[in-house]
Design a protein with these regions (language model features):
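Surface-exposed, interaction-prone regions used to assemble/regulate multi-protein complexes
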Residues: 1-182
C-alpha cells in the first residue's frame, strides 16, 4: 500500500484485518451522525469480514469534528464495522478511484412496511436467500445507511442497527470516543 495514502500501521491492520474489536464503542449510525459529520472526510477502504460484516476506514475531517477528534491537527482514522449487512449497493466513478471524498452520509431505520416490501422483492427476485430473510426478521429492526461522495459515488447498506466504532490517531494510537454532541 502507498505510504502517502496509508500509514504503515493502518496498512497492516487493513491487510491483516487486525483491528482491536474488543475495545469498540457500540452505537447506531444515526447516533454517530448526530455527533459528527463525514462531510469532506476521506474514505480510505472498505472490506468484508466473515459473517458479512462490513468495515469502513475513514480519515475523519478534524476541522468539521474538532471535539470528537480531540482537537487534533492531524485527521484521525474512524473505523466503522457493520456486523450484519443484509444487502449492499455501491456505484462509484473514475473520480472516486484514489480517495473517495465523502459529500454526505445519512442513516435511518426502515419502517416495517418498507422492510416487508423489500423482503418480498428480495425473495421473489432471488437476491435474498431464505437464511438472509430469516436473519432480517430475527433482527426486528433494520437500518439503511447511505454514504455519497462529492463525485456522485454511493454506498448503500441495509444493516442491523448496532455498529461498532474505533478511532485512531494518524500515528496509530487508539483514541477514546465521545458520543456527546458538542
Amino acid at each position: 500500500m502507498d505510504e502517502e495514502k496509508y500509514p504503515a500501521w493502518l496498512a497492516d491492520k487493513v491487510l491483516n484485518t487486525s483491528f482491536d474489536w474488543k475495545t469498540v464503542t457500540k452505537t447506531s449510525m444515526s447516533e454517530l451522525l448526530a455527533v459528527i459529520t463525514l462531510h469532506d472526510s476521506y474514505w480510505y477502504n472498505t472490506y468484508v469480514e466473515d459473517g458479512n460484516a462490513w468495515v469502513l476506514v475513514i480519515n475523519l475531517d478534524a476541522v468539521w469534528n474538532k471535539t470528537f477528534c480531540h482537537n487534533l491537527e492531524d485527521w484521525p482514522f474512524l473505523v466503522l464495522r457493520f456486523q450484519q449487512v443484509f444487502c449492499s449497493f455501491q456505484d462509484f466513478n473514475d473520480y472516486d478511484n484514489d480517495h473517495r471524498i465523502i459529500g454526505d452520509a445519512e442513516s435511518a431505520p426502515l419502517n416495517s412496511g418498507r422492510l416487508f416490501e423489500w423482503l418480498q422483492f428480495g425473495q421473489a427476485s432471488g437476491l435474498l436467500s431464505s437464511d438472509a430473510t430469516k436473519k432480517v426478521v430475527e433482527t426486528k429492526s433494520v437500518c439503511r445507511t447511505e454514504i455519497s461522495t462529492v463525485y456522485g459515488g454511493l454506498l448503500s447498506l441495509i444493516h442491523a442497527p448496532v455498529i461498532e466504532i474505533l478511532l485512531y490517531s494518524e500515528q496509530g494510537s487508539q483514541l477514546s470516543i465521545n458520543l456527546v454532541a458538542p
